Amino acid sequence: MKLATMIAAATLGGAALTSAGSAKAAGDYVSIVQEAAVNAPAAQAWDKVKGYCAIGAWLKTTCEITAGKDGEVGALRKIAGRVEEVIVAKTATSYTYADINPAILYHGTIEVVPVTPKTSKFIYTLFFDQASIPAEQREANRTRRAAMFANVLATMKAAAEAK
């Protein structure tokens, strides 16, 4: 079972908790999964993109580690001076992060999996609660996020394949 799938299942396994610890009403959860084939071995591809603030380059914005150690569980990053995310899980070739804003309870996983000894695949999974987004804006929001992360994967792929 993929790391992102396991985390999503754990999130849905019981009532979500707010920062105060009280039960939250059921949400409207969405998962967006993007994949990209990479012409590089998995370990080499991961080595090129594993930095927790590398996302700043992929999104063409700023990113800074504001707490903890880069790449370690518990590290907190701030993207574009406003979005704060914490690493909640990691493996040798992946990490999962969560937004600390409980409004949409989003988390994402970036992972690389081997396909052959010389090729691999990036998988970027975003999972979030769209209940706080007005119903008439949800489809456009999902489309915007999917396009943004498709661009992120294209940038990651280029970095991983660069000599």
Annotate each PLM feature.
Residues M1-A10:
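Bacterial N-terminal signal peptides that target proteins for export
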Residues L17-A67:
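Hydrophobic ligand-binding cavity/cleft-lining segments
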Residues A37, A54-A57, E64-H107, A158-K163:
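Glycine-rich portal/gate segments that line the openings of hydrophobic small-molecule binding cavities
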Residues N39-A43, V88-A92, E111-K121, K163:
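A short, structured loop/turn motif at beta-sheet edges
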Residues A43, D47, C53, A147-A150, ...:
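Solvent-exposed, polar/charged alpha-helical surfaces in well-ordered, non-transmembrane soluble domains
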Residues N101-N151, A158:
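Beta-strand/loop substructures that line and gate deep hydrophobic ligand-binding cavities in soluble
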